[in-house]
């Protein structure tokens, strides 16, 4: 009678930490990078989840704006130029990625006011 528990518990299917957190970005991989990167001696359980969520949010934000830029240019595929336009036209993203060069991104069209023809 003793020591046999309440019956056999069937082992449930493995569920990734990403799906538990409702994320698309890989929490396990982020955790591995945090451990291997020598950022700290120990890494808490919540840190990779939080970082993966932040990375996913930033990626979604940039892709949303780049998709809008592609649609404005009547294109169905996002190219580096659309990423550049999206980042540089958004004040906060431009500040965050100020020192970043996007390959094949080009520059923002900008003509100084003094160079424009004078209106009569």
UniProtKB/Swiss-Prot annotation:
Highest rank taxon of the organism: Eukaryota
Phosphoserine sites (modified residues): 2
Keywords: Acetylation, Chromosome, DNA-binding, Isopeptide bond, Methylation, Nucleosome core, Nucleus, Phosphoprotein, Ubl conjugation
Cross-link (Glycyl lysine isopeptide (Lys-Gly) (interchain with G-Cter in ubiquitin)): 119
Family per record: Belongs to the histone H2A family.
Subunit details: The nucleosome is a histone octamer containing two molecules each of H2A, H2B, H3 and H4 assembled in one H3-H4 heterotetramer and two H2A-H2B heterodimers. The octamer wraps approximately 147 bp of DNA.
Name the UniProt record assigns to this protein: Late histone H2A.2.2
Lineage: Eukaryota, Metazoa, Echinodermata, Eleutherozoa, Echinozoa
